[in-house]
C-alpha cells in the first residue's frame, strides 16, 4: 500500500507540474501576440517612439522605454536604423501609431 501511495503522489505531482509548465508557456506565446515588431527608421529614438505611443504622460514614457529596453535586451537606450524592436502595442491597434510594422 505504501508503494502504491508513493507512485500515486509522484504521478500526481508530475501531471500538475506539466500542466503548470504548459499554462505558463502558453501565456508567453499569447503575450507576444499582443505586441508588434517594428524596424527602427532613421531619426527614431526610444523617447520619440514613447511619445508617439504613450502621448503626454512622462511616467508612462519612462515605463515604456524601460519595458522596450528590457524585452529587446538593449544594453543602452540608443537604437539604430534597421534594429527590429518589439513594442507593447496591440497588433490590432498598431495602425493608429503609424509605425513601420515588420510582419
From Swiss-Prot:
Subcellular location field: Cytoplasm
User: Does Magnesium appear among the keywords?
Assistant: no
Recite the UniProt keywords alphabetically: Cell cycle, Cell division, Cytoplasm, DNA damage, DNA repair, Septation, SOS response
Q: Outline the extent of the LysM domain.
A: 36-87
Q: Which PROSITE patterns match?
A: LYSM (PS51782)
Q: Which InterPro entries match?
A: Cell_div_suppressor_YneA, LysM_dom, LysM_dom_sf
Homology family: Belongs to the YneA family.
What is the protein's name according to its record? Answer: Cell division suppressor protein YneA
| Pfam families xrefs | LysM
Q: Which GO terms describe its biological process?
A: division septum assembly; DNA repair; negative regulation of cell division; SOS response
Q: Which SMART domains does the record cross-reference, listed alphabetically? A: LysM (SM00257)
Q: Which GO terms describe its cellular component?
A: cytoplasm
Main role? Inhibits cell division during the SOS response. Affects a later stage of the cell division protein assembly, after the assembly of the Z ring, by probably suppressing recruitment of FtsL and/or DivIC to the division machinery.
Amino acid at each position: 500500500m505504501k508503494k502504491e501511495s508513493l507512485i500515486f503522489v509522484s504521478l500526481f505531482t508530475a501531471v500538475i507540474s506539466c500542466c503548470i509548465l504548459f499554462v505558463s508557456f502558453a501565456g508567453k506565446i499569447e503575450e507576444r501576440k499582443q505586441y508588434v515588431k517594428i524596424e527602427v527608421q532613421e531619426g527614431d529614438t526610444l523617447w520619440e517612439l514613447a511619445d508617439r505611443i504613450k502621448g503626454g504622460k512622462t511616467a508612462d514614457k519612462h515605463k515604456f522605454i524601460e519595458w522596450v529596453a528590457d524585452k529587446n535586451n538593449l544594453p543602452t537606450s540608443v537604437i539604430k536604423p534597421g534594429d527590429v524592436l518589439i513594442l507593447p502595442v496591440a497588433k490590432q491597434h498598431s495602425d493608429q501609431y503609424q509605425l513601420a510594422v515588420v510582419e
